[in-house]
Amino acid sequence: MSDMVDLKKFVTELGKTQKELKNVIEQAKDIGLELKTNFKMTPEQAGKLYKYIVDGIKEQIQANQPTKNPKQDNKDDLNTAATPKPLAKKASKTPKKEETKAQPKPKKTKEKKKEAPAPIIKKKEIEIVNTFENQTPLVENTPKAVSHSQIEKAKQKLQEIQKSREALNKLTQSNTNTTNNANSASNVSNAKKEISEVKKQEQEIKRHENIKRRTGFRVIKRNDETENETENSVTESKKPTQSAAAIFEDIKKEWQEKDKQETKKTKKPSKPKATPTAKNNKSHKIDFSDVRDFKGNDIYDDETDEILLFDLHEQDNLNKEEEEKEARQNINDRVRVQRKNPWMNEAGIKRQSKKKRVFRNDNSQKVIQSAIAIPEEVRVYEFAQKANLNLADVIKTLFNLGLMVTKNDFLDKDSIEILAEEFHLEISVQNTLEEFEVEEVLEGVKKERPPVVTIMGHVDHGKTSLLDKIRDKRVAHTEAGGITQHIGAYMVEKNNKWVSFIDTPGHEAFSQMRNRGAQVTDIAVIVIAADDGVKQQTIEALEHAKAANVPVIFAMNKMDKPNVNPDKLKAECAELGYNPVDWGGEHEFIPVSAKTGDGIDNLLETILIQADIMELKAIEEGSARAVVLEGSVEKGRGAVATVIVQSGTLSVGDSFFAETAFGKVRTMTDDQGKSIQNLKPSMVALITGLSEVPPAGSVLIGVENDSIARLQAQKRATYLRQKALSKSTKVSFDELSEMVANKELKNIPVIIKADTQGSLEAIKNSLLELNNEEVAIQVIHSGVGGITENDLSLVSSSEHAVILGFNIRPTGNVKNKAKEYNVSIKTYTVIYALIEGMRSLLLGLMSPIIEEEHTGQAEVRETFNIPKVGTIAGCVVSDGEIARGIKARLIRDGVVVHTGEILSLKRFKDDVKEVSKGYECGIMLDNYNEIKVGDVFETYKEIHKKRTL
């Protein structure tokens, strides 16, 4: 039993851990050896188990193994000693063939199948099992792939080795007697040698830990015809046996040289094929798990028909890093190519702006125009295009000036002038209506036209009465309160010559109406009351006339009143720069009386003389160009407009457009109420047939047909709508700060309805002037015409909402709906009353002004702390009076430490209402007891005053 091999030591010497003991026991079962953890084996059993575990040679062990023939044992020992240990072998039938030569071959085959039963291997069936994927081989610099021709050459050399070994076995049969006694000892020594070789392999593995390990291929090919030829071709050979390791070294060198040549030809190395999946249990296996260094070992045995081929693709791993670099380089190249596309070449907005700034400074690449024509209403991007500037530079310049705009916002005249100064441009502002106007007929005879005279002046100075006297019709009596509410235009004949008069309101609210009257006039007549002199609206009228560059004639009215001083009036006008003719000046001062009619003929003659001097002419042929003086809605006729023609002729049936309104002239009525068919220059008429009420001051253009008129009106409507949106988005820094500060601003929603467009415009402007930092009027809707139920629905959900009507009255249904919605409707006939009513409403919503009135002062001389009551200060009144219940400040060292109300005031032990100067008193404050000697009480009253607008 001393020669028995312990299983645990056997496992340890194999280089395996005790955890892998179970795997060794399972492998022992495969060869018919039943083992347990503490069992021991004979050296013969240990040798067979070692061969099976290490080399893969499967030799079955019988449960009751018979005594072996000494000759056969001797032959086995000789074979073991003569042949080096192969790296991988399979159980073969060849040793049984050498046992008895006299036995026939079929009998040997049967015995062979009985001794080592194994699954039948079909011809050329291969199964690949990858059981050692993570391990890498110890062999370095192995070739890449094994071709079929190389395998055939290796087979031929291995067959020659097999034949030489069979001849060597015959020579060793004669020495069986001498080696019989040492059979058992040799087996033990062989086992020990094998164990020592395993240890050497483990040491070799440790020394090659840093080397990439490769997986081996075991290709097993079964061919019955080759087997029969091998059995019958036993020949003697006295040549020395060449080791398989040396043969493989030669093969390896040949393959490496061929691989180098192939690598030079092809840039991309061939990739190893994927391992096929085992589909069939009957197919043979190619084991990937055996990892060996084949140097110095025989890899072939004459007793087996298997060939062990190693994965010789080390060149792939050596070039792996280079392949990754090339792949990354290819990816980078592709990315660079993709960036060179037409979209990526376009730079961002910032990059474009930077480039263009450089170009703008370079006069050779970008030239800025010195003089350009800019429309009166132009967008930011249009200005940049016309001025040949960078859009970003224009927006940046406006931003630096405190105006935040977008490229679609409109620029006003001030902004255009600032930009022109910043970029050193000469600009000429053009009228925006030129693009909508039809070119005038250049071929034609200009004929004399009547002068257009505008009467302007201060309110109640007698403008309408004077014009009424001229027309012999008392129009002023029909006006509410005797005040003209909107423009009136009339034709007057004098000495067979016609004069067109335009009457403008004198109230301050109608400033824009006076401005329009001055723009369409040829001569301005300024009416001044001799008993009142020059007033605010008089100065304003003079400024409008001066801006329109029209001559001015002064009419000194109310000369019939006693104690009038015309020289004083002339002196006041001279101070304004308007010197009379009799004082050596250029301006006519005509004394008139609208009440008696004195001086009217002299005034008309002066107007005609001035017109003759001016030589007023116009072309009567061609399409008409007129100015809308006033627009309104009349019952039964719809939208109507009072127009005065400047050039051409307007006839019934002509198509036209005025701003957003368009239509065809249905009827024309003069100032006398008569129907007319044609309207020539400087003539005034009331026309019908409009799609909507045109704004006062708009230009009416005659066109060829309705389609053109509609198209131009729609185009203008779109333009104005975009302009309105631009105004809503364009905000300056100051406006933005004001919006943030006025977050608690009270708004009064208002709807304004008037009889005419001019009156509506004047009311809106007057109401907006009443806005202040606390209360503001918000006009949510305005229009010409009566109050409707839709107007009520707009303000039904708003608090403090008001509907204002001027010269209109609501119907019964509208009044009932207003009560239902709790909406206030206020109607007026005089603009004074409307503005004053809204001013009172705003004042009621505004918080009053609080003022303080100082009443007295007392100094603290001593303090008394009374339990459950508080601190009472003994004081002496030093100024004024101290009263109970009044507000007081407690001042300590000049600093107010408390403000409250005097809760109790006593004189000795008596409660008093007030204490005068020089007397002592006791003061107790409400909810404050931190009073010290030396403090001062200062009493005051709060006086509330109403705000004024």
UniProtKB/Swiss-Prot annotation:
GO CC, alphabetical: cytosol
Disulfide partners: none
PANTHER family: TR-TYPE G DOMAIN-CONTAINING PROTEIN (PTHR43381:SF5), TRANSLATION INITIATION FACTOR IF-2-RELATED (PTHR43381)
Bias-annotated ranges (Low complexity): 174-190
Domain tr-type G per the UniProt entry, residue ranges: 448-617
Function: One of the essential components for the initiation of protein synthesis. Protects formylmethionyl-tRNA from spontaneous hydrolysis and promotes its binding to the 30S ribosomal subunits. Also involved in the hydrolysis of GTP during the formation of the 70S ribosomal complex.
Protein name: Translation initiation factor IF-2
Sequence segments annotated as region (G3): 503-506
Compositional bias segments (type: Basic residues): 209-220
Listed InterPro entries: EF-G-like_DII, IF2_II, IF2_N, P-loop_NTPase, Small_GTP-bd, T_Tr_GTP-bd_dom, TF_IF2_bacterial-like, TIF_IF2
Compositional bias segments (type: Basic and acidic residues): 112-122, 150-159, 191-208, 249-264
Region (Disordered): 61-122, 139-159, 171-284
Subcellular location(s) per record: Cytoplasm
G1 as annotated region, ranges: 457-464
Residue numbers binding GTP: 457-464, 503-507, 557-560
Protein family (similarity comment): Belongs to the TRAFAC class translation factor GTPase superfamily. Classic translation factor GTPase family. IF-2 subfamily.
Gene3D superfamilies, per the entry: P-loop containing nucleotide triphosphate hydrolases (3.40.50.300), Translation factors (2.40.30.10), Translation initiation factor IF- 2, domain 3 (3.40.50.10050)
Region described as G5: 593-595
Pfam family of the protein (one): IF2_N
